[in-house]
Amino acid sequence: MQESTTRTFGLLQWGIVILTSITALIHFLLGLNTPLTTGWPFLLNAAGYITLLLLYALKVPVLHRYRNVVRWLLIAYAAVTVIAWWLMEGARTPLGYFDKMIEITLILLLWLDGQRA
């Protein structure tokens, strides 16, 4: 089913924007507060979230036909981030658990958004 180009940006989409922004900010701040040798993956993760969020949220006609692909890329990106965190040793902090809760909720909202598209 194709999405309408006049689709409204509702609460579900705003939830996706807010959760993606929060997790991007968390990763950005972790990257800044960590030595560069270990902080760069956090900075790259933040950049990836922001890039995918912009591709998802901006109403650019050329990108509109790829919105479903971007949604699935964002789901995969969040899932890989959760799995990478789970595989890392020593990353079990309250902030880490909070961020993973955000990312799992983000995956759910993106999936719901895809079902309603």
Regions found by a protein language model. Give the residues of each.
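Membrane-interface extramembranous regions
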Residues: M1-A117
